[in-house]
């Protein structure tokens, strides 16, 4: 069986009226694409910075956020640019916007691997914290509005996301 892409719109006056009349414009579909890819690029940049600073906790968070955003894109569109697409976020020359579309089965396999890597990064962060070597293994509410720097809560969220992707 094939996976089915879906899109749900909340009830707003103008948009709902257009949908009820089957007057769906290109902008309705494009808003998901244009809204989420920059967020995935931000997560990729965060991942790059975490690796550069050897910050395993931040690396785990970045992997989870990247997977969360990309899973929403894949669920909405199916095959999408994935493996090469986010490299653009790290390039100084952003004129190259052409990339291949990757198979969603391969993307899902990679997202599972990313979430497993996130768990491994959190284990490393805890080991560093427990050993007394704390080279930025924690982060605070200043940069973590979701869980106030609580690695265990991020691990639970990542595991919940893993289960959602399995469905």
Label the predicted regions.
Residues 1-6:
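A short, exposed helix-loop element centered on a Lys and neighboring polar residues
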Residues 9-65, 71-167:
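Structured, solvent-exposed acidic/aromatic patches
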């Amino acid at each position: 069986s094939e996976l089915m892409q879906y899109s749900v719109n909340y009830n707003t006056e103008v948009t709902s009226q257009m949908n009820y009349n089957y007057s769906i414009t290109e902008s309705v579909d494009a808003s998901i694409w244009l809204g989420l890819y920059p967020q995935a690029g931000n997560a990729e940049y965060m991942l790059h910075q975490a690796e550069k600073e050897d910050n395993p906790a931040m690396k785990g968070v970045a992997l989870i956020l990247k997977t969360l955003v990309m899973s929403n894109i894949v669920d909405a569109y199916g095959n999408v640019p994935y493996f090469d697409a986010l490299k653009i976020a790290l390039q100084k020359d952003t004129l190259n916007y052409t990339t291949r579309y990757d198979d969603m089965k391969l993307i899902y396999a990679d997202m599972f691997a990313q979430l497993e890597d996130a768990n491994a990064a959190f284990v490393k962060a805890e080991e560093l914290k427990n050993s007394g070597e704390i080279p930025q293994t924690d982060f605070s509410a200043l940069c973590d509005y979701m869980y106030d720097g609580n690695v265990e809560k991020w691990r639970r969220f990542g595991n919940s996301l893993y289960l959602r992707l399995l469905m």
